[in-house]
Amino acid sequence: MKITGFRLGMLRVPLKTPFKTAVRTVRAIEDVVVLLQTDSGHIGYGAAPATAPITGDTHGSIIAAIQQYIAPKLIGQDVADLNRLCALVQHALERNSNAKAAVEIALYDLWAQALGTPLYQALGGGTPRITTDITISVDAIDTMVADALSALARGYGSLKIKVGKDSESDVERIKAIHAAVAGRASLRLDANQGWTPKQAVRTMRTLEDAGIVMELVEQPVKAADIDGLAFVTARIDTPVMADESVFSPIQAIELIRRRAADIVNIKLMKTGGLSNAIRIADIAALYGVPCMIGCMIESSISVAAAVHLAVAKADSITLADLDAPALGQFDPTEGGVHFDEAQLHIDDSPGLGIRRIRGLELLSD
């Protein structure tokens, strides 16, 4: 199966409600979609959102990187030579991790289709279902409590609560949600780099001293402040998870060796696709460090790839935060992964299993 061409498109899925963090507010999933075409008629699907505040990628940069630098290198290549093709993608240009992720996802989709098996089986197999948490966005306390109770009613057993704008208000938010949930769900906090190291320790100790048990706190300090992250990790009981601090396998090794965090959050848009995500999961497994599989505000195309990865690497990926499809007003994909609130199931279709994408607007060649 050889790659003969590619097309790009745009996909927009409005969110049910705005998604608010300490960093940004998002109102819709807006993905660049890549379709890799082959001589056998098979199509590989990949996608990536713009995440300028996190990775630096915009829709324009994603399109330019794929059109001008990445996709042309793949024309005429056999998808069976997956490792070499992924190396071509990664070395096509510096940074641009979202663009690389979109193309790599499409490559892995084609590779598994050529093998005639679902992607997770090609990656090593596993039980084709996982459970995700759901995010409670930063908002007024009453609204966040109502959102938490609504999530419980829809079957979610883990709530990821956005904090990080103001530590005193954060404490009140968590206390209110903790009281309302009353032990019916685990609580995960995500500060999105919003605290200083001392603020993080003070805030978390206040919550811990109040008897509030939290499953983890994610990226409490600035991404580049590894010393600060280690400072927090050493001084609180709640496990600390690194997100924006870990994009690459090398960063994962450094963070683990310095004991700067207890958990690593893997996101395909940070790692530049599946090849580096697999490396990070394997590194974490060697060190006995658990991982979360996470996502940006992105469509079910790329999240499906993350689900396949999580199933195949269940020895190290023990937590999932793949709620973006549940935040959208509709699921644009048909086939592959079935997103049913907290329960994510993979069918037995080859590759990602995507048959059609509703609402996709192809760009002119």
Predicted regions and their residues:
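Conserved, mostly hydrophobic/aromatic
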Residues: I3, V34, G41, I70, ...
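Glycine-rich phosphate/pyrophosphate-binding beta-alpha loops
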Residues: A48-D57, T135-D139, M292-C295
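Structured beta-strand/loop patches that form or line metal/cofactor-binding pockets in enzymes
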Residues: M1-S40, Y45-T55, L327-F330
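Flexible C-terminal active-site loop/helix
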Residues: T4-L15, I29-D31, M296-D365
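Catalytic core of soluble alpha/beta enzymes
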Residues: I161-G164, E168-S302, F330-P332, V337-F339
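Metal- or metallocofactor-binding catalytic centers and their adjacent structured scaffolds
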Residues: G5, Q37-A114
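N-terminal small/glycine-rich loop or linker at the start of catalytic domains
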Residues: Q113-S137
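Gly-rich Lys/Arg/Thr-decorated short loops/hinges at beta-loop-alpha junctions or inter-strand turns
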Residues: T127-T132, A151-S158
